[in-house]
């Protein structure tokens, strides 16, 4: 399904208080991995709360193409997995659409199989660098035929038997770490990932839950050493996917910015590797109450009650970036309404997301009257409390769902409306966004649907 075929602009207007209670769709990271590990494990995996966005569904289709049986009964997804080491060579290229996570993790998963697997994606995914995942796979004996710059479309030709490696991850990337660990599942011996900066750890937690022989040690310098023993048995599990903190960010920031708002968000994943945004907003003065913190399936979960707040600018520590990398666009929106200056640094990973997300945010802010400075790896925003004089612009989304949702949130609190040039790709991560926001009282309409 091509997003570029028929763009749907949307406009958000100044709204009255947002009120109500919502439950956010399932976490995208955990949903991708649930399909992958369920498809790989022996026996049956049952999943509730799965995020049914296009990206995750594409991962499910890829697992089906390699032998997993996946069906939905009511609200439950049921997977009959093939067993570790038993994936089949797909007959056609695996199409991941817009899904960088699905593509990169699956490259790791299948790379060490003695078979040939081809990967394709949409225009946005085909621009994104895959070398970061392909380089460790090459060390394990995988041959790669790729478009220029290690981009898709690409084909992996696996070795007869893969070599286990010890790999030091050169950037803070959960996808690279995960790809190497998944490659280790079908590799004899011990595969080790050395991670200097901790990133989201869903792969480690979930693989242990499925029965993989995986250990994590942190040395005296805080460097994590993750070891996986290959060719072990994985067994199907029951998974209830908690709400995605990256999707939670949009209604959460909207509730902070729209005067008089009071919104409760249920069942949000509070894994410490994912809560950088909440911490930062609290430092800015946000009224966010964490209710009933609990454990579900080995993950921290809580409900959040969010009330409209007067925010002040802060300096965000660069080392916090891995725990909120997807939330900077909507943080920049919050900063636009804060008193004073907000400085965000260490944002180099944003340059290689669905779009050059840093540039896209800066252009969008400028188009809507925000005083901001874009650096090589940084963004500084000087806010206007109350959103006075903000809005009135149209934002280029560059096929990026998070840019689209962030600027629609902006329009709810700015003086003048904000338009995004396309809203179709919101369906990749948060298909319910428009309806859920409208239910809270947000004025968002697709253009032509006024």
UniProtKB/Swiss-Prot annotation:
<feature type="binding site">
    <location>
        <position position="33"/>
    </location>
    <ligand>
        <name>3-phosphoshikimate</name>
    </ligand>
</feature>
<dbReference type="GO" id="GO:0005737">
    <property type="term" value="C:cytoplasm"/>
</dbReference>
<feature type="binding site">
    <location>
        <position position="175"/>
    </location>
    <ligand>
        <name>3-phosphoshikimate</name>
    </ligand>
</feature>
<feature type="binding site">
    <location>
        <position position="173"/>
    </location>
    <ligand>
        <name>3-phosphoshikimate</name>
    </ligand>
</feature>
<keyword id="KW-0057">Aromatic amino acid biosynthesis</keyword>
<dbReference type="GO" id="GO:0009423">
    <property type="term" value="P:chorismate biosynthetic process"/>
</dbReference>
<feature type="binding site">
    <location>
        <position position="357"/>
    </location>
    <ligand>
        <name>phosphoenolpyruvate</name>
    </ligand>
</feature>
<feature type="binding site">
    <location>
        <position position="353"/>
    </location>
    <ligand>
        <name>3-phosphoshikimate</name>
    </ligand>
</feature>
<protein>
    <recommendedName>
        <fullName>3-phosphoshikimate 1-carboxyvinyltransferase</fullName>
        <ecNumber>2.5.1.19</ecNumber>
    </recommendedName>
</protein>
<comment type="subunit">
    <text>Monomer.</text>
</comment>
<feature type="binding site">
    <location>
        <position position="128"/>
    </location>
    <ligand>
        <name>phosphoenolpyruvate</name>
    </ligand>
</feature>
<keyword id="KW-0808">Transferase</keyword>
<comment type="function">
    <text>Catalyzes the transfer of the enolpyruvyl moiety of phosphoenolpyruvate (PEP) to the 5-hydroxyl of shikimate-3-phosphate (S3P) to produce enolpyruvyl shikimate-3-phosphate and inorganic phosphate.</text>
</comment>
<feature type="binding site">
    <location>
        <position position="100"/>
    </location>
    <ligand>
        <name>phosphoenolpyruvate</name>
    </ligand>
</feature>
<dbReference type="InterPro" id="IPR013792">
    <property type="entry name" value="RNA3'P_cycl/enolpyr_Trfase_a/b"/>
</dbReference>
<feature type="binding site">
    <location>
        <position position="28"/>
    </location>
    <ligand>
        <name>3-phosphoshikimate</name>
    </ligand>
</feature>
<dbReference type="InterPro" id="IPR001986">
    <property type="entry name" value="Enolpyruvate_Tfrase_dom"/>
</dbReference>
<feature type="active site" description="Proton acceptor">
    <location>
        <position position="326"/>
    </location>
</feature>
<dbReference type="GO" id="GO:0008652">
    <property type="term" value="P:amino acid biosynthetic process"/>
</dbReference>
<keyword id="KW-0963">Cytoplasm</keyword>
<dbReference type="InterPro" id="IPR036968">
    <property type="entry name" value="Enolpyruvate_Tfrase_sf"/>
</dbReference>
<comment type="pathway">
    <text>Metabolic intermediate biosynthesis; chorismate biosynthesis; chorismate from D-erythrose 4-phosphate and phosphoenolpyruvate: step 6/7.</text>
</comment>
<comment type="similarity">
    <text>Belongs to the EPSP synthase family.</text>
</comment>
<dbReference type="GO" id="GO:0009073">
    <property type="term" value="P:aromatic amino acid family biosynthetic process"/>
</dbReference>
<feature type="binding site">
    <location>
        <position position="29"/>
    </location>
    <ligand>
        <name>3-phosphoshikimate</name>
    </ligand>
</feature>
<dbReference type="Pfam" id="PF00275">
    <property type="entry name" value="EPSP_synthase"/>
</dbReference>
<feature type="binding site">
    <location>
        <position position="28"/>
    </location>
    <ligand>
        <name>phosphoenolpyruvate</name>
    </ligand>
</feature>
<keyword id="KW-0028">Amino-acid biosynthesis</keyword>
<dbReference type="GO" id="GO:0003866">
    <property type="term" value="F:3-phosphoshikimate 1-carboxyvinyltransferase activity"/>
</dbReference>
<dbReference type="InterPro" id="IPR023193">
    <property type="entry name" value="EPSP_synthase_CS"/>
</dbReference>
<dbReference type="InterPro" id="IPR006264">
    <property type="entry name" value="EPSP_synthase"/>
</dbReference>
<feature type="binding site">
    <location>
        <position position="326"/>
    </location>
    <ligand>
        <name>3-phosphoshikimate</name>
    </ligand>
</feature>
<feature type="binding site">
    <location>
        <position position="402"/>
    </location>
    <ligand>
        <name>phosphoenolpyruvate</name>
    </ligand>
</feature>
<feature type="binding site">
    <location>
        <position position="175"/>
    </location>
    <ligand>
        <name>phosphoenolpyruvate</name>
    </ligand>
</feature>
